[in-house]
Regions:
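Nucleic-acid endonuclease domains
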Residues: 1-186
Length: 186
């Protein structure tokens, strides 16, 4: 089934392997597509490469439970939502819990940094929609870094379509996490 309600538990190493499978699949598709199709494949490949870099920041045996598994119909296997995986990796680095990290469901925010609710958004190649949140901060992981944006400032970071940037600075850069994710090379 192709639904965000599907949940998957895998190790970081297994998720890295899924990224490799998707890169191989996109490379096969790219060879048969027109210019627009090749461009879409190239974006998907870049996204998977960034995700691999982020996954390499945690031990391969770290277990993650994520929502948003989809793509069974076209792939023959499931691929998790990239944002859910990134959220788990962020939680791994910012919380005490280092085993069985899970994406949170239905709380109005993704996790708390101390007592401050925080919403995690991911925009590695295409822009994430800046949705309203109860959280005081948005933690944006994009292709050029990890950014902390105050709730009142989120809308000043979006483009005309209300999307957060994938290749621009946005808010206050969290240098140590950006470097750990390999996002300091852009």
């Amino acid at each position: 089934m192709n639904t965000y309600a599907n949940i998957m538990t895998k190790s970081a190493g297994e998720m890295f392997d899924l990224c490799e499978r998707e890169i191989d699949r996109q490379n096969e598709i790219k060879s048969t597509e027109n210019r627009v199709g090749r461009s879409n494949c190239a974006k998907a490949i870049r996204k998977m490469e960034k995700l691999e870099s982020i996954l390499m920041s945690v031990p391969a045996e770290t277990m993650f439970t994520v929502e948003g598994c989809r793509g069974d119909n076209e792939r023959g296997w499931s691929l998790c939502n990239v944002g859910s995986i990134v959220e788990c990796v962020v939680k791994y680095h910012l919380s005490k819990e280092k085993e069985n990290v899970s994406k949170t469901f239905g709380s109005g925010y993704d996790f708390k940094m101390g007592c401050i609710p925080c919403e995690v958004k991911t925009s590695l190649t295409c822009n994430a929609l800046a949705t309203p949140s109860e959280a005081e901060f948005t933690l944006l992981v994009n292709a050029v870094g990890v950014w902390l944006i105050k709730k009142a400032e989120v809308m000043s970071c979006v483009n005309a379509r209300g999307r957060l940037p994938f290749n621009l600075e946005a808010g206050k850069r969290i240098d140590w996490l950006s470097e750990r994710f390999g996002l300091d090379e852009e």
